[in-house]
Curated annotation (Swiss-Prot):
Gene3D superfamilies: Ribonuclease Z/Hydroxyacylglutathione hydrolase-like. Its cofactor is Zn(2+). Belongs to the metallo-beta-lactamase superfamily. Glyoxalase II family. GO terms for biological process: methylglyoxal catabolic process to D-lactate via S-lactoyl-glutathione. SMART domains: Lactamase_B. HAMAP family: Glyoxalase_2. Binds 2 Zn(2+) ions per subunit. Monomer. CDD domains: hydroxyacylglutathione_hydrolase_MBL-fold. The gene is gloB. Pfam families: HAGH_C, Lactamase_B. One of its GO terms (molecular function) is metal ion binding. This is Hydroxyacylglutathione hydrolase. SUPFAM superfamilies: Metallo-hydrolase/oxidoreductase.
């Protein structure tokens, strides 16, 4: 299996998995044009589309792709039923694509119906988990997003986190504002800054590393707790997550 990233819009990535036979799976195609160009250039045969949630920058290209390749099966959560989904999937179910089983994980927060797809080592997490950050809470609650991130953080260490946006540099600037002396955060920030200066992608990331540099996955970390306690005493990790998310929204 080969993992490919297709840039779209200002900062989206459309992920494509292809096998040796050229069959491919497309994740969150917000725009059809760059996907069609990649299909043509690589001689791929699209077999399926995975949708993580209903936002236009993740579903906008579905109609055109299905018109061009009517054999495509479009998997998605209930909230994408009117966006071209032909196979609604929910938490605990599996999608069998390209000879692999993908587990469906409900991750409400960014939207209420958001889902992720996991087949070791690939995690397609849409706008739930970003490198160094997490999605904004457009529909869900901080508690829901905290629980969603906890689920994803529990996946195997070698999981490849395939996020849908290039937000890593701004996320790491925020992380530094919270934990300015953290060695892992400082090292990763320098690495990301160099990559982005060359206009290079920072994704996918390995989950084991992500747990060290993503403050939203470190709500039980004593260093972070001490920083938060300087401003306010919060007993529960969900409350500390909400504090972080509120800070990030204003950053």
């Amino acid at each position: 299996m080969n993992l490919n990233s297709i840039p779209a819009f200002d900062d989206n990535y459309i992920w494509v998995l292809n096998d040796e036979a050229g069959r491919c799976l497309i994740v969150d195609p917000g725009d059809a044009e760059p996907v069609l160009n990649a299909i043509s250039a690589n001689n791929w045969q699209p077999e399926a589309i995975f949708l993580t949630h209903h936002h236009h920058d993740h579903v906008g290209g579905v109609k055109e792709l299905v018109e061009k390749f009517p054999q495509i099966v479009v998997y998605g959560p209930q909230e994408t039923q009117d966006k071209g989904t032909t196979q609604v999937v929910k938490d605990g179910e599996t999608a069998f694509v390209l000879g692999h089983e993908f587990s469906v994980i409900a991750t409400p927060g960014h939207t209420l119906g958001h889902i992720c797809y996991f087949s070791k080592p690939y995690l397609f997490c849409g706008d739930t988990l970003f490198s160094g950050g997490c999605g904004r809470l457009f529909e869900g609650t901080p508690s829901q997003m905290y629980q969603s991130l906890k689920k994803l953080s529990a996946l195997p260490d070698d999981t490849l986190v395939c996020c849908a946006h290039e937000y890593t540099l701004s996320n790491m600037k925020f992380a530094l504002s919270i934990l300015p002396h953290d060695l892992s955060i400082n090292d990763y920030y320098r690495k990301v800054k160099e990559l982005r200066a060359k206009n290079q992608i920072t994704l996918p990331v390995i989950l084991k590393n992500e747990r060290q540099i993503n403050v939203f996955l470190r709500t039980e970390d004593i260093d972070l707790i001490n920083v938060i306690n300087e401003e306010t005493l919060l007993q529960q990790p969900e409350e500390r997550f909400a504090w972080l998310r509120s800070k990030k929204d204003r950053f």
